[in-house]
């Protein structure tokens, strides 16, 4: 946050909460999902005014897509990446990436 990593104390404390919650899930969470949850809990605890999240995989199915009403969504490029998960054409990948955009989002 503000160019600084999450302090070790907060990382350990929040990490324990995330790991315990993850163990209660029917489907195991991915490492990216666990790290996303940890970051979001830290940002909430720190009462951040603004948080910029980078989508890790596409958009529609990405773990960052839990934000109910983001103010802004930006798609920087549509390349043939993660084709196994997103599709093998630019159109399919664009559709997956557009899944991060929600009503009312600029």
Range-by-range predicted roles:
Residues 72-79, 101-106:
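Conserved beta-strand/loop subsegment of P-loop NTPase cores
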Residues 1-68, 80-94:
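ATP-dependent carboxylate-amine ligase catalytic core
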């Amino acid at each position: 946050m503000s160019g600084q990593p999450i302090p070790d104390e907060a990382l350990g404390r929040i990490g324990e909460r995330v790991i315990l919650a993850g163990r209660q899930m029917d489907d195991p969470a991915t490492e990216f999902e666990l790290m996303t949850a940890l970051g979001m809990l830290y940002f909430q605890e720190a009462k951040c005014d603004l948080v910029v999240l980078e989508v890790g995989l596409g958009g529609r199915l990405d773990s960052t897509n839990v934000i109910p009403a983001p103010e802004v969504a930006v798609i920087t490029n549509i390349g043939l990446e993660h084709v196994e998960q997103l599709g093998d054409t630019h159109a399919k990948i664009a559709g997956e990436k557009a899944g991060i955009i929600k009503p009312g989002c600029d």
